[in-house]
Amino acid sequence: MKVVLITGMSGSGKDTLAELLALYLDDKNLNVWIQHNADPVKYMANVYFDVDNYKTNEGKKIMMGITDLMYSIDAYYFEKLNMKKVPKDTDVLIIPDWRYLNTRYYFEGKEENEVYTVMVQRTNARDYSVEVKRKEERLLSNLEPLIVINNDGTIIDLEHTAENLANYVALDLTAKKV
């Protein structure tokens, strides 16, 4: 299975890129599945902390705290949990909210996987408190993605980038910049 891990600051366009990438890969007759690592975290935040809005400073802090706690118990907690949802016939798994090296290690540790790491950058991404931004920046600085995408253009530009990325994933080409 090919695994595309997409990271970037909040509001950088990760989900949009994932959706566009899935469309282009689907056009190549590949079975694509998008799975967010944060889905179980959002569920826990809602059930245990009554968090409905994850895009606030408080929501972000709670979600980061839950993630840190669960990863301290099991380094691959969310990866194992989420893989139960991925259909067996999946050719390409897209995770558009990659934040931790654990995720990369989990998928790279399985011989049958080919892992592609992507960072989406955007100048005017969503603005959070200094504390939340610093934690996000610290997490992202450790990831060392293979591909870096600048998303300061139009949606048409991002579509072209997604198409190029789909070709890269489908053809197993080697590149550093899309």
PLM feature spans:
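Hydrophobic anchor at the beta1->P-loop junction of P-loop NTPases
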Residues: 6, 95
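Hydrophobic positions on the alpha1 helix immediately C-terminal to the Walker A/P-loop
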Residues: 17
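P-loop (Walker A) phosphate-binding loop of NTP-binding proteins
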Residues: 9
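ATP-dependent small-molecule kinase phosphotransfer cores
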Residues: 30-92, 99
